Curated annotation (Swiss-Prot):
It comes from the Eukaryota. One of its GO terms (cellular component) is cytoplasm. Interacts with DLG1 and DLG4. May form a complex with DLG1 and ERBIN, where interaction between LRRC1 and ERBIN is indirect. It is a peripheral membrane protein. This is Leucine-rich repeat-containing protein 1. The modification Phosphothreonine is found at residue 480. Its main location: cytoplasm. It comes from Homo sapiens. InterPro entries: Leu-rich_rpt (IPR001611), Leu-rich_rpt_typical-subtyp (IPR003591), LRR_dom_sf (IPR032675), LRR_R13L4/SHOC2-like (IPR055414), Synaptic_Scaffolding_LAP-MAGUK (IPR050614). Keywords: Coiled coil, Cytoplasm, Leucine-rich repeat, Membrane, Phosphoprotein, Repeat. It is found in: Cytoplasm; Membrane.
């Protein structure tokens, strides 16, 4: 009986073999019979541990994929692959690249990422046809001083290494378009970085940079700049020269201001400045006419600039966890705004003009001090309106009411007015010895005063028959919290009691505090 064998075994002229994800432990023997014609060999994602001597007789190879194996050695015979154009040995266990790699003169794309390498061979810069080099996550401590000899290099990835400086010759890579230096230990960026005029993407996130050189403004073709997770205290005014920039990520730094030159970035689409120390945004940000996403989370902003209303393409605005006490009415000018988040601020009102942002679908105002919402919000087609962390549904049922201070029609619901945000345990523990501070932690004077407007005050006047006392005695009943607020208050005081009982050095106050809390929880 005859058995049909695979066509690629019959045909002696095979140019490509794909054996990825085949659980191979050894290189298949049948591959070698095609040594005269094989140009592409893909053995990625197997369990190969070594490359036999016979393997390097495949001298016609132009593309070799060996990534995601367990290869422990790259032999000097790699030099036999003189026609090799693409080599991927990423995510193996190769401790060293042989100097003989320099004989692979045709090599254009190489990926050595994810190996236990600590250095590149000195001969590496002789691979002058190399256009794309990836050496991410290999514990690389330094680059060859003559790396600038790779003058055809267009993409260089050096992410997640141990680099502390960049050799001067790096700036000779005049054709470089992508440079990824993220998650290293670089303290200074050389001024000569401004010579990389063809650079389009520059990643410097996760380093130790305290400043950027003025020369960075020379990168007229730069599209993406990521300098997040550094120690930047300021940005150079020359950043205004990055006229092609579309993405600017400067999150997690120490910035207190943004230069006015930001307004000259007319093509800027994404601006992320979260987790800094900004107290204000420059009015110039309103000149970034192409801005679609603005992230300002976790700063110290008190308000937003009026010019923000000029951002007609802005679709996502996030200013969570700041110190905002008000919003400009010009926010309604953001006619493309779909997501607006101002969670955990100090807002007491939302301007009615926000309803002019007719594309708004998500509004997150949880964790503020809002008394009510403007009636104009009913004109929006909201899909989610968040007022509380404990809100079970994205939309609530609202009632129309009247603001007795202004006479305006307003919206209210069971979650309004908002309670102030709950203090953290670390903030409470040092103060929990004082009973009055405990009360302050679970109530707010502003809430008590303003709640009167929601529920009429009830006064009980003592009978006039008591003529011996001429004083008029009254009992003022404050507004009763909604059921949801009562549960929140009960949970708050119970958590405080547990934290305080566990704290050391507070035994003397324990009975007094527990007694006070028991009275509160019992009434709830």
């Amino acid at each position: 009986m005859f058995h049909c064998i695979p066509l690629w075994r019959c045909n002696r002229h095979v140019e490509s073999i794909d054996k990825r994800h085949c659980s191979l432990v050894y290189v298949p023997e049948e591959i070698y019979r095609y040594a005269r014609s094989l140009e592409e060999l893909l053995l990625d994602a197997n369990q190969l541990r070594e490359l036999p001597e016979q393997f390097f007789q495949l001298v016609k190879l132009r593309k070799l994929g060996l990534s995601d194996n367990e290869i422990q050695r790259l032999p000097p015979e790699i030099a036999n692959f003189m026609q090799l154009v693409e080599l991927d040995v990423s995510r193996n266990e190769i401790p060293e690249i042989p100097e003989s790699i320099s004989f692979c003169k045709a090599l254009q794309v190489a990926d050595f990422s994810g190996n236990p390498l600590t250095r590149l061979p000195e001969s590496f810069p002789e691979l002058q046809n190399l256009t794309c080099l990836s050496v991410n996550d290999i514990s690389l401590q330094s680059l060859p001083e003559n790396i600038g000899n790779l003058y055809n290099l267009a993409s260089l990835e050096l992410r997640e290494n141990l680099l502390t400086y960049l050799p001067d010759s790096l700036t000779q890579l005049r054709r470089l378009e992508e440079l990824d230096l993220g998650n290293n230990e670089i303290y200074n960026l050389p001024e000569s970085i401004g010579a990389l005029l063809h650079l389009k993407d520059l990643w410097l996130d996760g380093n130790q940079l305290s400043e950027l050189p003025q020369e960075i403004g020379n990168l007229k073709n730069l599209l993406c700049l990521d300098v997040s997770e550094n120690r930047l205290e300021r940005l150079p005014e020359e950043i205004s020269g990055l006229t092609s920039l579309t993405d600017l990520v400067i999150s997690q730094n120490l910035l207190e201001t943004i230069p006015d030159g930001i307004g000259k970035l007319k093509k800027l689409s994404i601006l992320k400045v979260d987790q800094n120390r900004l107290t204000q945004l420059p009015e110039a940000v309103g000149e970034c006419e192409s801005l679609t996403e603005l992230v300002l989370t976790e700063n110290q902003l008190l308000t937003l600039p009026k010019s923000i209303g000029k951002l007609k393409k802005l679709s996502n605005l996030n200013a969570d966890r700041n110190k905002l006490v008000s919003l400009p009415k010009e926010i309604g000018g953001c006619c493309s705004l779909t997501v607006f988040c101002v969670r955990d601020n100090r807002l007491t009102r939302i301007p009615a003009e926000v309803s002019q942002a007719t594309e708004l679908h998500v509004l997150d105002v949880a964790g503020n001090r809002l008394l009510h919402l403007p009636l104009s919000l009913t004109a929006l087609k909201l899909k989610a309106l968040w007022l509380s962390d404990n809100q079970s549904q994205p939309l609530l049922t609202f009632q129309t009411d009247t603001d007795y201070t202004t006479g305006e029609k307003i919206l209210t619901c069971v979650l309004l007015p908002q309670l102030p945000s709950e203090p953290t345990c670390q903030e409470n523990l040092p103060r929990c010895g004082a009973l009055e501070n405990l009360v302050n932690d679970v109530s707010d004077e502003a809430w008590n005063e303003r709640a009167v407007n929601r529920v009429s005050a009830i006064r009980f006047v003592e009978d006039e028959k008591d003529e011996e006392d001429n004083e008029t005695r009254t009992l003022l009943r404050r507004a009763t919290p909604h059921p949801g607020e009562l549960k929140h208050m009960k949970k708050t005081v119970e958590n405080l009691r547990n934290d305080m009982n566990a704290a050391k050095g507070l035994d003397s106050n324990k009975n007094e505090v527990n007694h006070a809390i028991d009275r509160v929880t019992t009434s709830v």
